[in-house]
Amino acid sequence: MEILIIVIAAVVGLALGFAIAKMLEKKQASGTIASAKKEAGSILKEAKAEGESIKKDKILQAKEKFIELKSEHEKVILSRDKKINDAEKRIKDKESHVSNELGKNKKLNKDLEEKVADYDHRLDFLEKKQEDIDKLHNSKVQQLEVISGLSAEDAKAQLIESLKDTAKADAMSIIQDTVEEAKLTAQQEARKIIINTIQRIGTEEAIENCVSVFNLESDDVKGRIIGREGRNIRALEAATGVEIIVDDTPEAIILSCFDSVRREVARLSLHKLVTDGRIHPARIEEVVKKTRKQIEEEIIDIGKRTVIDLGIHGLQPELIKMVGRMKYRSSYGQNLLQHSREVAKLCGVMAAELGLNPKLAKRAGLLHDIGKVPETETEVPHAILGMQWAEKHGEKPEVCNAIGAHHDEIEMNSLLSPIVQVCDAISGARPGARRQVLDSYIQRLKDLEEIAFGFGGVKKAYAIQAGRELRVIVESEKVSDEKASNLSFEISQKIQTDMTYPGQVKITVIRETRAVNVAK
């Protein structure tokens, strides 16, 4: 029973609490609604005020935009009206100009028609005059034919033939005079150019280049160079390919070899060995190997210095090396580099005298004998071989042709070719240039003259042109014209039989007859 009362009391308490809570909630909600209504009224009032303000601003902006668009539209209309007015004005001006031009053209056409009519009248008059002249001409021609007894065609043919013969005679006379003058002038100019060229070049005589002499401080060094049982000298000869001659010559050893490079390698190697003091086969091989490398470097330096001295640029490295190697080559005993430098200078001077390119001429002169550089023999002539190398290394066609044609192996098609040929002959043919020291050169000239004096009737004999020509003056009483021809042949045969000489010897026999009388 007590439990039931407690449960009922609890239920009643809960119901009462719930009712009180509901009453409190309703009271609170009514207060909130009133507040919200008040706040909503305030917001609505503010929104209306702001909307009126925005509406006024938009209306004002729309008015301003309308005014702006109206102003721009008026400007466009004004501009368009101006363009239309300008176009109308230009059209009116053109119409006026066209009208003026039409008026002028009408006037010109009228003047032209009048001139054409006048010219037609004149042409008719001239044609009539021409007919009268033709009739008169034919009449005169007929009268002349009757008087001369020749027709007009025959007279014309005779006149043409006479004029032709006269013109031929005059032309032949002019041609002969021109040819003679050209020959004389050409010879004089050629002599002048060659003489000027030679005078401006200083040259040296050739040197003997088959042996070199290595000087020693004392004869005691000779034994060390020879070595025990000659092993050092044999090792040196085997390493260099040079014959080493040790004789009784005091303080000197002779190095003999046709190859200048080998001889120079041997000389420098000996100098290093003697200076160092260590002379034995192993050391000899080491020094010779280093010396060969040094010589190769010197060859390149010599080539570079040579082309710089001559003012030649753009030469390929392989050609520069060939130029340097020329120092250790010889041609008929003449040092090849000295000869090529000399020819290059001669070519430069001669080309300048003739108004040609001196630099190109120097280039051709320097390279003209590069075909003689290789150590091994070849079946190709050195001029052709040099031309092939020059072509291979990009030299100009004029230079290549000058190299290949300087001994007439190919046809000359460049003005440089005869210049190189002439300068090569000048350098090689002068006294003492090639292997013949002055004494042997003079002796050969004397022998030529002695052979001429060995024949009867010879009055005088002169060896000239560096021994390339022998002029023989004979006594006219003893030698007739027929015998003079036979004498030159006999002298040439005698020279061929008894003498050794380079090139050719020209024999010229001169017979002179003089008749002298005295008027008293």
From Swiss-Prot:
Query: InterPro entries given for it?
Result: HD/PDEase_dom, HD_domain, HDIG_dom, KH_dom, KH_dom_type_1, KH_dom_type_1_sf, Ribonuclease_Y, RNase_Y_N
Pull one GO CC term from this UniProt entry: plasma membrane
Bilayer-crossing residues are 1-21
**Domain HD as annotated: residue spans:** 336-429
The KH domain covers which part of the protein?
210-295
Pfam families, per the entry: HD (PF01966), KH_1 (PF00013), RNase_Y_N (PF12072)
Q: Which terms are listed as keywords in the entry?
A: Cell membrane, Endonuclease, Hydrolase, Membrane, Nuclease, RNA-binding, Transmembrane, Transmembrane helix
Tell me the GO molecular function terms.
RNA binding; RNA endonuclease activity
Q: What EC class does the entry list?
A: hydrolase
Gene Ontology terms describing biological process: mRNA catabolic process
**What is the annotated localization of this protein?**
Cell membrane
Under Enzyme Commission nomenclature, its number is: 3.1.-.-
Query: What membrane topology is annotated for this entry?
Result: Single-pass membrane protein
Q: What is its main location?
A: membrane
Q: Which domain of life is it from?
A: Bacteria
Coiled coil ranges (UniProt) are none
Reported function: Endoribonuclease that initiates mRNA decay.
Q: Tell me the protein family, please.
A: Belongs to the RNase Y family.
Q: Which HAMAP family match?
A: RNase_Y
NCBIfam families, per database record: HDIG (TIGR00277), RNase_Y (TIGR03319)
UniProt-recorded name of the protein:
Ribonuclease Y
What is the gene name? Answer: rny
